[in-house]
Amino acid sequence: MAKKKSNTTTILVPDPLRKSVELATGGKGTVLYTSKGYPTYMTIVPSFNCEDVADDLGTGKHPAFIVDGVDKSEIFIATYQSIIHDGQALSLPYQRPRTSINFNDAKAACIEAGPGFHLMTNWEWAAISFWCMKNGFFPRGNTDYGKSHSHPDKVGLRSRDYGITLTGSGPDTWRHDGTMSGISDLVGHVWEWIDGLQLIDGKIKMPSDNNFCQPENKWPDAGSKIDAVNGIQISDAITKRGWTSQWFRDIAAKEGYDVPVALKRALLCPCDAIAGKSEIPGYVWADNSKKQKSAAFRGGSFVDGATAGVFALDLKYAPSSSYCYIGFRAAKAL
């Protein structure tokens, strides 16, 4: 089937706030507006090809930049973890992020913001993480009750809650690109619900591209399973069930099993540039129990210390789960 025509985004409506943000960030950031007219700060992530970041990811545009078969020249990721105002998810600096929210309510608040807005997807998170890997910069964050566990002199502004800081209040090293123009708080602070990835009976389910409007029951089976062997093993069969965990960098495939390239592109199995590298941050937890349906959250929280990171992933909680250390982030594709 022929690929649909690529489209290019042009933002035509100037205003003082948008202009000031774009000038301050050198064009890396902008301000979009929700359907109710509220400003929301977004970081522009230009598209790239899989072969640009790793040799074993295949070729062609990374799936984060393909939405239902349509190529996108960029995606917009909320610069800050979301708050909810008037029913809509907003990205604003120096706010206490919304937490104690379940997956469905987080997703609904993002959609309520207007056309193209959605809960950040696993494909989008993977793309940003690959960018960090390729550029040799792994952001730190609030991983120890308001400060970095590895650099305790680096702190954010505390909210009224014990470990939560105000969005974007940390240092440059808490941004995805090491500058104040980058996406803040991806590591630590609060875990972030992620759309486009589920673990059901140990089977990995995800859309084939960044089609954030596709119903979950239409997602294809990725063809792989998580087996609770040697921590976490990617396999075509399950021999052991239950809660299990592993450093992302150390996740391996069953001997003789050829991992689909899509799983590497989706950060579910490490590519060669990540595998076994001790400097790669992020721990993975999963529950492959029978009849267990797990939604995904990523990044870690303010209590997770060294296990937090851009490669951190939790696949052991139901979508109905709601905790003080789980929040979310919006994204948009035009």
PLM feature segments, named:
Residues 45, 77, 110, 128, ...:
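Generic structural hydrophobic/aromatic packing signal, biased to beta-strands
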Residues 133-138, 198, 207-209:
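Short secondary-structure boundary/capping segments
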Residues 60-186:
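Short aromatic-cysteine micro-motif
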Residues 2-11, 158-162, 173, 177-180, ...:
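C-terminal, surface-exposed recognition/capping segments
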Residues 127, 198-202:
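Flexible loop/turn segments at secondary-structure boundaries
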Residues 32-116, 201-241, 327-330:
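Extracellular adhesion/carbohydrate-recognition regions
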